[in-house]
């Protein structure tokens, strides 16, 4: 019974649906010293469950052949299978999973003794990390198992993945809420105790704390509740306090026992808070600039006469000399020219404050007119529907 206490299935329809959509399904069950078999064709049993031998092993083998009557394409993607099986191996430390593709004689073996620690290491490969991986596993009093692994790196993105009974929740849920609350509280408490916030004169937010964070949250819940059949968000209320309590205890101890790592993490968070504040100020400056202000900027906009964005075109050209030629050859009624000087910033690799303080990027933002940032961006305000 213990094997199924935290099963991923909720409605008992998994193999039933596979069976209904298969032209053939074959079951082999090894249990209580005997081997049982049964076969189905388009969902109908071909014979009753029968004993075909003896064994000292346990386990179930399910083989199925998708029905061409249902699916127009029955080719399996080895990449999709590999991604999910690798994920399952990370989530279940010590479980060995073998993926064979007999079409091309390929075999992949997934066996990660380190579990979630190795999951974080795999995601952060090629990045510079700020701390050694923090990893803990604990069982709460209410039977909920909590496992967390995390590490900060030098990127600016948050990458947190949530799982309940090995099932991923892309929309998070109560386990994510508990994790975030404990993480922010633990870091704020550490920085206050070290007097870092007063000394650096910054106010940090939860977003600052999670910049560059890679984390895996895995909970084992006896009776999970999800927001929908697809299980993309966990809504079990008892999970939040379980995760929050476990994370509070373990993470606070980690920060105290690893002062160098704690200092590096705090430094990154303070930098993120400063960048956020600088970005806010720069965004306000950009917002105050109207399209008329662009004439005074290094990249001079030669606007078109047309006021309907659907009929207006914007040409981005390199340098003033190209801009001059383009202005002479354009159709003034509908074609606007914006010369941009020098090498434009690679915004994908730049922090938001650096991006928005770039003169050329600022010129572009103002010329396009649709704003920037989560609160400001509105594509309906775009001044040109054709940008070349």
Swiss-Prot record:
Entry EC no(s): 5.6.2.2
Catalyzed reactions: ATP-dependent breakage, passage and rejoining of double-stranded DNA
Keyword tags: ATP-binding, Cytoplasm, DNA-binding, Isomerase, Nucleotide-binding, Topoisomerase
Lineage: Bacteria, Pseudomonadati, Pseudomonadota, Gammaproteobacteria, Moraxellales
Sites annotated Interaction with DNA: 343, 346
Subcellular compartments: Cytoplasm
Protein name: DNA gyrase subunit B
Cellular component annotations (GO), alphabetically ordered: cytoplasm
Entry-linked PANTHER family: DNA GYRASE SUBUNIT B, MITOCHONDRIAL, DNA GYRASE/TOPOISOMERASE SUBUNIT B
Keyword ATP-binding annotated: yes
Family label: Belongs to the type II topoisomerase GyrB family.
UniProt GO BP: DNA topological change
Note: Few gyrases are as efficient as E.coli at forming negative supercoils. Not all organisms have 2 type II topoisomerases; in organisms with a single type II topoisomerase this enzyme also has to decatenate newly replicated chromosomes.
Domain Toprim: 312-388
CDD domains (UniProt xref): TopoII_Trans_DNA_gyrase (cd00822)
Transmembrane annotation, as ranges: none
SMART domains with a match to the protein in the record: TOP2c
The protein's role, per its UniProt record: A type II topoisomerase that negatively supercoils closed circular double-stranded (ds) DNA in an ATP-dependent manner to modulate DNA topology and maintain chromosomes in an underwound state. Negative supercoiling favors strand separation, and DNA replication, transcription, recombination and repair, all of which involve strand separation. Also able to catalyze the interconversion of other topological isomers of dsDNA rings, including catenanes and knotted rings. Type II topoisomerases break and join 2 DNA strands simultaneously in an ATP-dependent manner.
UniProt subunit comment: Heterotetramer, composed of two GyrA and two GyrB chains. In the heterotetramer, GyrA contains the active site tyrosine that forms a transient covalent intermediate with DNA, while GyrB binds cofactors and catalyzes ATP hydrolysis.
Domain of life the protein comes from: Bacteria
